[in-house]
Regions:
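A short N-terminal beta-strand-loop micro-motif at the entrance of redox/enzyme domains
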Residues: 19-34
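C-terminal helix-cap and adjacent tail motif
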Residues: 4-5, 9-19, 172-209
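Small-aliphatic-rich amphipathic alpha-helix that forms the alpha element of a beta-alpha
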Residues: 35, 39-40, 91, 111-161
Length: 209
């Protein structure tokens, strides 16, 4: 028999979905702080914690984000998820490559020349993604809806300029948070279906499904 905590966690994982239709009702400060504090529990290489979060609350701040990322009136008029723009909170997770290069130049790591070739994959983005996932799961546990979405390359400069993001930090996307209306249409992508376990898990040796 599963322990109560395990059952509750499985329920959070099962209920986790991308919400695209939000009420404009504000998120209580203590609830938002819980989401952000849990993000700090994310693992990071060398305990670098090379992530940061730009938090935009309320219509005045969120409108500034949409004005530089979704300023085409024609696109807005035909947008399939207009109530996405009603989300009362946007969190932009940012990663710092330099923080990792500096951390691994310290004596206990010994990569003193700060060479990028030491890194087989960009752990600064991966670790920030871990933090983002903890926010998504905490949102479910707190009764909120959440959506992780990308910021197109052509909009990054505008986001940096609008909110004063330092060059050392790279936005990896954005998270919309708020109370779900319960009325969003499912993404057409879901028609693809979820892959079965045997299609993605290779035990002991790579094998074709």
């Amino acid at each position: 028999m599963c322990e109560r905590g395990a059952v509750e966690f499985q329920d959070v994982v099962r209920r986790r979905r991308m919400v695209r239709s939000f009420e404009s009702t504000p998120v209580p400060a203590d609830t938002l702080d819980r989401v952000l504090r849990n993000a700090l529990r994310a693992p990071s290489a060398g305990f670098t914690q090379g992530f940061a979060f730009l938090v935009l609350e309320g219509e005045e701040q969120t409108k500034r984000f949409w004005s530089v990322t979704f300023d085409d009136a024609g696109r807005r008029s035909t947008f399939a998820y207009p109530h996405l723009l009603d989300a009362p909170v946007l969190v932009i997770p940012l990663s710092s490559k330099q923080a990792y290069l500096d951390r691994y130049a310290e004596p206990d790591k010994g990569v003193s020349d700060r060479r990028e070739s030491f890194w087989p994959v960009p752990y600064w983005h991966i670790d920030t993604g871990f933090a983002a996932m903890l926010m998504l799961l905490t949102a479910v546990d707190a009764g909120l809806g959440a959506l992780f979405f990308g910021i197109f390359p052509e909009h990054l400069a505008g986001v940096r300029a609008e909110f004063g993001v330092p060059d050392a930090f790279t936005p990896i996307g954005a998270i919309a948070l708020g109370y779900a209306t319960g009325g969003d249409a499912p993404s057409p992508s879901l028609d693809r279906g979820r892959k079965p376990l045997d299609a993605v898990v290779h035990r002991g040796h790579w094998s074709e499904p």
